[in-house]
């Protein structure tokens, strides 16, 4: 069940759904707008010959923070990681679905590639997978509305929510745009 604006406010007021900082004007009819933080993670194209999900490649990306008051310019065909300004904390019976903003999509900005699902129990900044599919650069302003988070009520609480031991919650408590930790899940067949 998708939560309405009334249900979202009730969950926030009850302290079950955490959004920090919270701005009530960001609550939409069935979602909460999310804003862009000021840090970005860009790919260092000269450090590696290719990306290998099985390998830890610590220098594959580096953090870039625009000068205060300046935008980050995302060029055509570029892919960078960003994150939400807000920290989200979901209880064991609520999950989230991150979607882009229609107005930004019409400019060629994709907010996430594949990781739009937020597990119950997650707590942290949401990493954004930002792509410019337009043929002109797009300016990304820290603090701008960058997406919307829909909250879904589970039919029952999760038995092992994100963050539980043994679940492999690699991104619990993440701060800022967090690089891939796919190597932690990689199993080679022999």
Swiss-Prot record:
EC number of the protein: 3.5.4.30
UniProt entry keywords in alphabetical sequence: Hydrolase, Nucleotide metabolism, Nucleotide-binding
Cysteine-cysteine disulfides: none
Location of the region described as Disordered in the Swiss-Prot/TrEMBL record: 161-190
Record site feature (Important for bifunctional activity), residues: 116-117
Keyword Hydrolase attached: yes
Listed pathway(s): Pyrimidine metabolism; dUMP biosynthesis; dUMP from dCTP: step 1/1
Broad class of enzyme this protein falls into: hydrolase
Catalytic activity: dCTP + 2 H2O = dUMP + NH4(+) + diphosphate
Stored Pfam families: DCD (PF22769)
MF (Gene Ontology): dCTP deaminase (dUMP-forming) activity; dCTP deaminase activity; nucleotide binding
Residues annotated as binding dCTP: 101-106, 119, 127-129, 148, 162, 174
Compositionally biased spans, kind Polar residues: 171-190
One of the GO BP terms on file: nucleobase-containing small molecule interconversion
Catalytic residues as annotated in Swiss-Prot or TrEMBL: 129 (proton donor/acceptor)
HAMAP family recorded: dCTP_deaminase
Function: Bifunctional enzyme that catalyzes both the deamination of dCTP to dUTP and the hydrolysis of dUTP to dUMP without releasing the toxic dUTP intermediate.
Summary of subunit composition and partner proteins: Homotrimer.
Family: Belongs to the dCTP deaminase family.
Name of the featured protein: dCTP deaminase, dUMP-forming
Species per Swiss-Prot/TrEMBL record: Mycobacterium marinum (strain ATCC BAA-535 / M)
Name of encoding gene: dcd
């Amino acid at each position: 069940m998708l939560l309405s604006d009334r249900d979202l406010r009730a969950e926030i007021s009850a302290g079950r759904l955490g959004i920090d900082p919270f701005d009530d004007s960001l609550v939409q009819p069935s979602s909460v707008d999310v804003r862009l933080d000021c840090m970005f993670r860009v790919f260092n194209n000269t450090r590696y010959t290719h990306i290998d999900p099985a390998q830890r490649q610590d220098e594959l990306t580096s953090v870039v923070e625009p000068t205060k008051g300046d935008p980050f310019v995302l060029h055509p065909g570029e892919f960078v990681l960003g994150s939400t300004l807000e920290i989200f904390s979901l209880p064991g019976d609520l999950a989230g679905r991150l979607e882009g903003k229609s107005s930004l999509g019409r400019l060629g900005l994709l907010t996430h590639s594949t990781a739009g699902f937020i597990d119950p129990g997650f707590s942290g900044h949401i990493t954004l997978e930002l792509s410019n599919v337009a043929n002109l650069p797009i300016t990304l302003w820290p603090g701008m509305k960058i997406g919307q988070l829909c909250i879904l009520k589970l039919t029952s609480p999760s038995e092992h929510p994100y963050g539980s031991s043994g679940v492999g919650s690699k991104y619990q408590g993440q701060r800022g745009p967090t690089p891939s930790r796919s190597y932690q899940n990689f199993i080679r067949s022999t």
